[in-house]
Amino acid sequence: MKLRPLHDRVIVKRVENETKTASGIVIPDSAAEKPDQGEVLAVGPGKKNDKGEISPMAVKVGDRVLFGKYSGQTVKVAGDELLVMKEDDLFAVVEK
């Protein structure tokens, strides 16, 4: 199934955090926090401004982004847990 977000929404798949600390301590699943990074899988066309023109999105498919731990709405698609959120919920794009 392919999703096409509407307006200024993006679809993000969470990227799992490391399960081991820098000193080698393994973090159990029960203590692990929700990841706050993800990969953009799809982007909407953009948000309409006051003049009715569509403002282009600042992110593109494949970008790695930072967001709040509780941002977006979780949806399950073909067994994958994805997030649908507004572009405004994104904090930054991780540059390589």
Swiss-Prot record:
Keywords: Chaperone, Cytoplasm. One of its GO terms (cellular component) is cytoplasm. SUPFAM superfamilies: GroES-like. InterPro entries: Chaperonin_GroES (IPR020818), Chaperonin_GroES_sf (IPR037124), Chaprnonin_Cpn10_CS (IPR018369), GroES-like_sf (IPR011032). GO terms for biological process: chaperone cofactor-dependent protein refolding. PROSITE patterns: CHAPERONINS_CPN10. It holds the Pfam family Cpn10. Signal peptide: none annotated. It is found in: Cytoplasm. Its main location: cytoplasm. It comes from the Bacteria. The keyword Metal-binding does not apply. The keyword Hydrolase does not apply. One of its GO terms (molecular function) is unfolded protein binding. Heptamer of 7 subunits arranged in a ring. Interacts with the chaperonin GroEL. Belongs to the GroES chaperonin family. NCBIfam families: PRK00364.1-2, PRK00364.1-5, PRK00364.2-2, PRK00364.2-4. Together with the chaperonin GroEL, plays an essential role in assisting protein folding. The GroEL-GroES system forms a nano-cage that allows encapsulation of the non-native substrate proteins and provides a physical environment optimized to promote and accelerate protein folding. GroES binds to the apical surface of the GroEL ring, thereby capping the opening of the GroEL channel. This is Co-chaperonin GroES. It comes from Albidiferax ferrireducens (strain ATCC BAA-621 / DSM 15236 / T118) (Rhodoferax ferrireducens). The gene is groES.
